[in-house]
Amino acid sequence: MNTLDLVSHGPVIPVIVIQRVADAVPLARALLAGGVKVLEITLRTPVALDCMRAISAAVPETLVGAGTIRSVADAQAALDAGCRFGVSPGYTRDIGRACRDIGLPLLPGVATASEVMAASADGYDFLKFFPATAAGGVPMLKALAGPFADVLFCPTGGITLQTAPQFLSLPNVRVCGGSWLTPQDAVDAQDWARITALARAASALRQVA
């Protein structure tokens, strides 16, 4: 799988933090019921890898990826947990080359023109623009489109259901990352119906963007 394949499954990739393994499978099923198939599980909790394994085994219709990859070891652990892709908050040549060597498709993070050049030089032309809002948002992506007409972006960070259409309307944006689909209070309360509703609203952005 190529990371660019992810865009064919919907306009938003949820950026997910899971605190309890028991929540992983019902959360994935709730998102899938709302039309969201691609899931980014961040490596920000001790149970993240176990959650990836659980979802991959119990909900094979999903495409599980690992977010917050910051080292070669993280990339290998994600692959071993059954992840189909990885996402990093930034880019280093070591991570980029390691992911290619082990066969883990990577969506590397960038925030500046220099970082875009570094990732592009290593063969990555679909990049995570992070943190999207803090790094300049829509105006910055418009500015990057000039010198980097061959690069596509997945803006992530500070995006909401209300602002996502502004990003998705850009010609160099194919998909957005968003944490708003899985608010922590809804997960803690196991309010799967609310999460399904949020997923449906995000999926509908494909039609209105």
Language-model segments: residues:
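Conserved N-terminal beta1-alpha1 strand-loop-helix module at the mouth
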Residues: 1-84, 101, 150, 161-162, ...
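Anionic-ligand binding region
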Residues: 113-127, 137-147
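Short hydrophobic/aromatic-enriched beta-strand-loop microsegments
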Residues: 62-66, 84-90, 105-109, 125-131, ...
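Short acidic active-site motifs
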Residues: 51, 73-74, 94-95, 114-115, ...
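Hydrophobic, well-structured mid-protein blocks that either form specific transmembrane helices
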Residues: 74, 79-119
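CoA-thioester-processing core
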Residues: 99, 106, 137-148, 155
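Glycine-rich phosphate-binding active-site loops on the catalytic face of alpha/beta enzymes
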Residues: 85, 89-95, 128-138, 172-194
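Glycine-rich beta-to-alpha transition loops that act as phosphate-gripper elements at the mouths
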Residues: 17-21, 66-72, 88-92, 108-113, ...
